[in-house]
Design a protein with these regions (language model features):
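Internal, well-folded beta-alpha domain core
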Residues: 34-191
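Glycine/small-residue-rich interface belts in oligomeric ring/scaffold proteins
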Residues: 1-57
Length: 191
């Protein structure tokens, strides 16, 4: 999702959590994400524990150690299956109104530096950012030639062609509790 890319790029710059939503807002940025390979998934079962308030406690007499009550573990531990995309490669095109942030990001990416290790949400999903280039967007091209995802409002289904839809968060803003989603977008793509 767009929000994942915004968070990933903000982490590269070392921006504090919930501080970058205006930079990547709908009217100040544009992001395009294109898969560069056929996406394959793998299902991996994992045991999970609850992280609700009150379930995680500090261990008495031990600095920095947290524990979950064994009774909570016995009752609440669940096996869940997570689906991961395997060896994925994406092209990300970015336009920012904030020229200073864009230049700083370009400098970080072109030199292979990042403040925080780029990841797609989990430590198992570390990202490697390569082939960083700058280009100028020009009018023209074939508006019918799309091999990626397309916003739902621009989709014209073709009989006999499979099509999938996915609704994802697109925009966020900071609030008293951290952040809230302010807009969603639905994308269509060929499976």
């Amino acid at each position: 999702p767009r929000t994942t890319v915004a968070g990933l790029l903000a982490a590269v710059l070392g921006e504090p959590r919930d501080s970058y939503y205006d930079t990547f807002a709908k009217d100040t940025s544009a992001i395009a994400i294109s898969p560069e390979c056929e996406l394959q998934t793998q299902s991996i079962p994992q045991l999970t524990l609850p992280t609700k308030g009150g379930n995680i406690m500090t261990a008495d007499g031990v600095s920095g150690k947290t524990v979950v009550d064994p009774e909570v573990i016995a009752e609440e531990r669940k096996r869940r299956t997570f689906e991961y995309v395997v060896d994925a490669a994406y092209r990300i095109d970015l336009v920012l109104d904030d020229t200073e942030t864009f230049e700083r990001l370009a400098e970080f990416l072109e030199s292979g530096r990042s403040t925080y290790t780029p990841s797609l949400g989990k430590t198992e999903c570390l990202a490697d950012i390569t082939d960083v280039t700058r280009s100028t967007v020009e009018d023209g091209g074939n508006p019918e030639d799309v091999d990626s995802t397309v916003p739902e409002e621009h989709v014209v289904p073709t009989p006999g062609e499979p099509l999938r839809m996915e609704r994802t968060p697109a925009y966020m803003e900071a609030d008293d509790g951290g952040r809230k989603t302010t807009g969603f977008v639905s994308y269509a793509f060929a499976p």
